[in-house]
């Protein structure tokens, strides 16, 4: 069994046996990610996909407090969301494209909070295995952090339209057991058994025909490709509110979060 380790600053990447393990390594920030983090994640996923020694990819977060708390609110603004090649919007779309087009199974190993962008990653991967102490949910409307297009609408293919809207629009928190019942995760186990459960899933997948697995994964992806392609032709935020970042609404959301107070969004209704 060989082990390969690649050097990154915000993530850890290790290939051991036929499993590539990608770890968001910002535990002091609950594994919240910056645009740079997303770039590294994307590079790692593509690397795993191109590696003939890799059969399964496992995505996780460092520590036992969070899989990922989503985008780092302290660096989120108009420039980081919509400006140029380093925008959150563009970079996240590239990451989810990597998850889809890496035709090897991608498993999200969730231990702790999977919130906001961390929740996105948990439900767009092929499988999600969670510890029983994990918590799932969205955060965008609560902190005025915009998300749009396929990233949002894909959730209805996982849990159904009504529940997807509830998750996205109400920002409630859901236990691992609730997530299992709704189809957000595939399995829930005690935290002490999480690595063994993930390893079991990896072993099962590695025993199967890699080409047939690729065909199945691409078939699922192609079934919704027309929706994704249509939504990626334009920016929905610019249609709904082209002056969103200049309006002060996003600033109020992020400042309220940093100040640990309830935001006042009344002026923007």
Which residues are covered by each model-predicted region?
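Glycine- (often His-adjacent) and acidic-residue-rich active-site loop
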Residues: 5, 61-98, 114, 142-144, ...
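C-terminal long alpha-helix characteristic of the crotonase
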Residues: 27, 129-134, 185-232, 265-269
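Terminal low-complexity tails and localization/encapsulation signals of metabolic enzymes
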Residues: 1-8, 255-269
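Conserved CoA-thioester-binding segment of acyl-CoA-metabolizing enzymes
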Residues: 1-60, 97
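Well-ordered beta-strand positions
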Residues: 127, 166, 170-172, 178, ...
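CoA-thioester-processing core
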Residues: 95-101, 109, 115-169, 182, ...
């Amino acid at each position: 069994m060989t082990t390969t380790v690649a050097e990154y600053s915000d993530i850890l990447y290790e290939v051991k046996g036929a499993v590539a393990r990608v770890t968001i390594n910002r535990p002091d920030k609950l594994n919240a990610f910056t645009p740079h983090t997303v770039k590294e994640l994307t590079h790692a996923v593509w690397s795993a996909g191109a590696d003939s020694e890799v059969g399964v990819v496992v995505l996780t977060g460092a520590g036992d407090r969070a899989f990922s708390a989503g985008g780092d609110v302290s660096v989120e603004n108009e420039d980081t969301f919509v400006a140029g090649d380093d925008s959150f919007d563009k970079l996240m779309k590239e990451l989810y494209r990597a998850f889809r087009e890496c035709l090897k199974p991608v498993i999200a190993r969730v231990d702790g909070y999977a919130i906001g962008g961390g929740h996105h990653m948990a439900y767009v991967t092929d499988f999600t295995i969670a510890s029983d102490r994990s918590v799932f949910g969205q955060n965008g409307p609560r902190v005025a952090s915009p998300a749009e297009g396929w990233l949002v609408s894909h959730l209805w293919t996982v849990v159904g339209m009504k529940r997807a809207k509830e998750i996205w629009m109400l920002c409630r928190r859901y236990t691992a057991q609730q997530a299992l019942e709704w189809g957000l995760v595939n399995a829930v186990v005690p935290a002490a058994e999480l690595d063994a459960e993930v390893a079991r899933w990896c072993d099962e997948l590695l025993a199967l025909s890699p080409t047939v697995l690729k065909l199945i994964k691409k078939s699922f992806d192609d079934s919704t490709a027309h929706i994704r392609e249509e939504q990626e032709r334009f920016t929905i935020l610019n249609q709904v509110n082209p002056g969103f970042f200049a309006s002060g609404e996003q600033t109020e959301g992020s400042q309220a979060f940093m100040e640990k107070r309830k935001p006042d969004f009344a002026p923007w209704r």
